Every structure is written in structure tokens, then in C-alpha cells.
Amino acid sequence: IGPMLIDRYAFTLVESGNMALGMSLISLFSPAFFGRIDPGPARRRAWMANFSLLVAALYLCVGLVHHATLNLALVVCIAVLSGYSVLQYSDVRSSYPPDLTGRALSVFTMAMFLGVGLVQSLTGWVADWAQGLGLEPYRAVMATIAALLALGSIAFRWLPASPLLQHPGVQGKDLA
């Protein structure tokens, strides 16, 4: 976000840093908020898919809209809404029997870091490609992130749910 604010709107390093700090502070608390409003195993997967589509739309708007105040508001919304990702941990916990939960959470965490690395690599390539064509890189990067989130949401909807989510009483009390 910092480089985009500097390149698009001539923000100073301090101004863009303040925005990054604000986003970081919001990101500290938004997962706790989503943890408190977790709808439970029956509706959690739909929430995750829908929030990822909403965040995808916000990223697309950041890429397409060239208005500093609106982009700042969109980025703050992304920071607030990205707390929904904590629901994925609850979903993993609810999807595996207690003796496999630790391993499942470890695999999920490693897969998430792999995904972050792949997206960073891909968006770096997209930015270079866009610049080579004389296009604004931030538009291409934000559109790519939006497309990846939308594709991920669609794939998640098609993945079969765990049988434990269909019969939550099998595992005992849902602590997620």
C-alpha cells in the first residue's frame, strides 16, 4: 500500500507509513472481533467464502479507482474485514478429530504461508509485466489479488465439507 500511495498520490514516506501503521493496528483487533461473532460450524464456511468475495471486490476497487480518500477508506475496510481469516482456523479445528487437530492446523498454517509467498511472487511478476507494457502496476496487481481471492472463494465453495461439520456432535463440544 505504501508504494501505491507514494506513486499515485504523492504521499510522503511518513504519510504512507502512518497509513501502514493504522492498518497494522486495525489488523491486530479485527481477528478478535471476527472470533467473537463467529457464526459457528454450520454457517462459518459460507461466511468465509462471502467475506473473501467482498474483500476481492474491495481490492478491485482499489485498483480501478484513482481517488486518494476513497482508496484510503477502501484499504481501511480491507484491514477491518481481513480479520475474517481467523475463521479459517476455527474451520480447520472443527473439521478434524481431536487427535489430528494439531497436525491439521500446522499444515493449514504452512499452506497459508506458501500461498502468501506465491501471491507475492506472482504480483511482483504482474507489476513488472504491467510496467513493461506502460500500464500502471497497481491496477494490475490489485486486479490480480482480487481475481485470486475470487478464485479461491469459488474453489472453497466447491471443496467438500468435513463430515464432522455435517455432524458436529460427533466430535463433542465445538470449542472453535
Task: Specify the residue positions occupied by each region the protein language model found.
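Short amphipathic helix-loop junctions that connect adjacent transmembrane helices
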Residues: I1-E15, D128
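A membrane-interface helix-boundary motif in multi-pass transporters
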Residues: T12, W125-A147
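Helix-to-loop junctions at the C-terminal end of transmembrane segments
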Residues: S30-R43, A127
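Structural signature of the two symmetry-related core transmembrane helices
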Residues: R45-L60
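Multi-pass alpha-helical transporter architecture, strongest
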Residues: G63, A143-A176
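Hydrophobic core of transmembrane alpha-helices in multi-pass small-molecule transporters
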Residues: T69-V86
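Intracellular juxtamembrane helix-capping segments at the cytosolic ends
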Residues: G83-P97
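A late C-terminal transmembrane helix in Major Facilitator Superfamily
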Residues: P98-Q131
